[in-house]
Regions:
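Terminal peptide-recognition signature
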Residues: 28, 61, 81, 111-113, ...
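Conserved helix-to-beta-strand junction in the class I
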Residues: 37, 127-129, 187
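Residue-level detector of alpha-helix initiation sites
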Residues: 13, 50-52, 120
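Glycine-rich cofactor phosphate-binding loops and adjacent beta1-alpha1 units
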Residues: 69, 83, 88-161
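C-terminal hydrophobic helical "lid"/dimerization subdomain
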Residues: 173-217
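Structured surface patches comprising rigid loops and adjacent beta-strands/short helices at the edges
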Residues: 1-8
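Mid-domain Rossmann-like dinucleotide-binding core that forms the NAD(H)/NADP(H) cofactor-binding site
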Residues: 18-95
Length: 217
C-alpha cells in the first residue's frame, strides 16, 4: 500500500487484529463521519449490522457518543450486534425496519443511515429519517434502481449521498488515514473499540485460500 495509507499497529493489538482495521475503518470513517456528519448524541441506523462494515460502524459510533440501531437477518446476528454495543437490533426478515426505527425514536426518525442495500430500501429509509437526516449509500445489494417520495425529501430537508473508495485517489485515502490516526487510534489503545476476527487462514496454502473464499461467499 502507498505509505500515506499505512498506519501503525495499535498498542496492544496483534498484527492479525490490526489487519482487520483498514478496509472497514476507512469506509466507516469516510461515510458515516465525513459524508454522514454523525455527531455525538445523534442516532445512526446501520443496514447489515453483522457485516464487517456493520461491526466497525457499531463500535466506532458508540465510542464517539452516538446511539446505534442496526438491522440483521437472524435473531442470532441481532444478538451479536447487541453484544458489540448496538442499542437496538431489528430482524429485517420479521419486522419492518422503517416502522421499528420510528418506534425506537418516538416517531422522530434517525439522523444518519449507512445503507449497503439500496433498491427498494431507499423509499422506506427516506420515511424513517429525521428532519435534516442523511442517507449514505455504499453498496447496492438490493438493486441499483430506487424510487422515493421527493416531497418528503424536501419537507424534511434530507441529504441522499453515496460513495465508493476504490476509485478515489491515493491522496484522498491518505487523508482518511490521517483522520483515523487522529480520531480513532486513541480509542483503539484505550480499548473502546475491540477487534472482531472470525477466523484466520494461511494465505500461502491453497486450501486455506479456498476455504477463505468459500467463507466469504
Amino acid at each position: 500500500a502507498p505509505v500515506g495509507q499505512c498506519l501503525p499497529v495499535p498498542q496492544g493489538w496483534s498484527d492479525v487484529e490490526a489487519a482487520s482495521l483498514p478496509e472497514t475503518l476507512f469506509t466507516v470513517w469516510s461515510n458515516v463521519f465525513d459524508r454522514g456528519r454523525l455527531q455525538a448524541g445523534e442516532t445512526l441506523l446501520v443496514q447489515g449490522g453483522s457485516s464487517g462494515i456493520g461491526v466497525t460502524a457499531i463500535q466506532l459510533a458508540k465510542a464517539l457518543g452516538a446511539r446505534v440501531i442496526v438491522t440483521a437477518g437472524t435473531d442470532e446476528k441481532c444478538a451479536a450486534c447487541l453484544a458489540l454495543g448496538a442499542d437496538h437490533a431489528i430482524n429485517y426478515k420479521t419486522q419492518d425496519f422503517a416502522a421499528q426505527a420510528l418506534r425506537l425514536t418516538d416517531g422522530r426518525g434517525v439522523d444518519v443511515i449507512l445503507d449497503m442495500v439500496a433498491g427498494d430500501y431507499v423509499e422506506r429509509e427516506v420515511q424513517c429519517l429525521a428532519e435534516d437526516g442523511r442517507l449514505v449509500i455504499i453498496a447496492v445489494q438490493g438493486g441499483v434502481q430506487s424510487t422515493f417520495n421527493a416531497a418528503v425529501l424536501m419537507r424534511k430537508r434530507l441529504t441522499v449521498t453515496g460513495s465508493t473508495l476504490r476509485a478515489r485517489s491515493v491522496a484522498f485515502k491518505s487523508e482518511i488515514a490521517r483522520a483515523c490516526l487522529r480520531h480513532v487510534w486513541p480509542l483503539l489503545a484505550d480499548g473502546a473499540f475491540k477487534p472482531v476476527v472470525h477466523r484466520v487462514f494461511d494465505a500461502t496454502d491453497a486450501d486455506g485460500a479456498a476455504q477463505a473464499h468459500a467463507l466469504m461467499e
